[in-house]
Amino acid sequence: YYDNIGYADLSDFFYVWLRRSLRRVVPDLFTTLAVPKTEELVATPYRHGSKDKANAFFLDGMTRAMRRLADQAHPAFPVTVYYAFKQSESQTGEGTASTGWETFLGATIRAGFAISGTWPIRTELGNRILGQGTNTLASSIVLVCRRRPDDAPTATRREFITALRSELPRAIAHLQRSNIAPVDLAQAAIGPGMAVYTRYSEVLDAEGCALTVREALALINETLDEVLSEQEGEFDADT
């Protein structure tokens, strides 16, 4: 959950009472006064000293985890990753992007994976307390990944944008036909957009510098806005 939920911190509430009752029964499980937290893979600024250090910790740990998955993956079968994360998007000079998704996708790509698709799965109840009156996810997004070929080609930024504009409309139409909730569309569109981005070993800008994941996400969101605007232009007055 990146920085959304600190399960180790929450577990301390129960741990102290369990330890009091059970440490003589299962002493090996209750050797510490509180829940161990150093290996928990979350981006908690107070634990690491700053947001940047917390982000670096998450990126490094997630890269190592994903690399182990990539090393064990069989070429005949995809790896599916369940990553239920919702974060308010940030506006920068590069466009709109989400740090949680950016960091997770960066780790996935660094591990040698290419994203081949996404599947939105309705996992959340519409009447749950957390979701009432808020813009929370109605579905969770499953990413489908495969090892990126060692001979994957490079592309220019213009070629990447052209491919996005060519392929994203069909992908969005498919997602909409699957009855995905509108609040989840931007999250789900990351998959087909990143499928284009990760098919290349690198996407280079006009100066020959590699396009970052944040820049790619901003371009995907921009293209998504264009696709949705075109769809609205086709509606009749009643719609």
Residue ranges and their predicted role:
Residues Y1-T239:
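S-adenosyl-L-methionine-dependent nucleic acid methyltransferase catalytic domains
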